[in-house]
Amino acid sequence: MKKIVLALTFVLVGSFMLAGCSKDEILNHYNNIVQSAGSIELTGKSSLQGEKEKGIDDYTGTYTADYANFSGTEYLFGGTSIKREAGKDLSIDCTLEITEGTAKVFWISGSDEAVTLIEVTGTYSDTITLPDGGNYIGIECENFTGNIELNIE
């Protein structure tokens, strides 16, 4: 019974808060909530193997790292924005050097399979267009020794 009363209270409070808001204001509030939730998926700065400089939002910035026998996945950039203020296009420049093990830089969108951007020593440069919803760029490593320089604008 308490759960029902609590749920109804939230619905009523939410209704009063949104009363008088335009459709665009409601969508902007919703987008902000969704974006905040999407930031949780990113690997925390203290858990990253390298140094990350944030750009204008969670989708952009630079990341450089030297790895030594690292196994794991780092979600570096991205989020769950419905309407990204800076537009849907991201310019990606990446230099990957693999000394040992394997590493692949990937882009995952929604529930789609991850798209490998680069997985061999070399460079990658392209512009991708993000669909609405969750989009993340990361690196997946297995006993990886090497380095990465990643710049996203």
Regions found by a protein language model. Name each.
Residues 100-116, 152-153:
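Short, surface-exposed beta-strand/strand-loop-strand elements in extracellular ectodomains
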Residues 69-90, 127-132:
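Extracellular and analogous surface-interaction loops
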Residues 88-98, 139:
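A short beta-strand element within beta-rich, extracytoplasmic domains
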Residues 17-20:
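C-terminal motif of bacterial Sec signal peptides marking the signal peptidase cleavage site
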Residues 140-153:
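Edge beta-strands of jelly-roll/beta-sandwich modules across compartments, strongly enriched
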Residues 61, 131-135:
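A glycine-anchored, Pro-Gly-centered beta-turn/N-cap motif
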Residues 1-5:
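Positively charged n-region of N-terminal signal peptides that target proteins for export
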Residues 24-81, 115:
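Transition segment at domain starts
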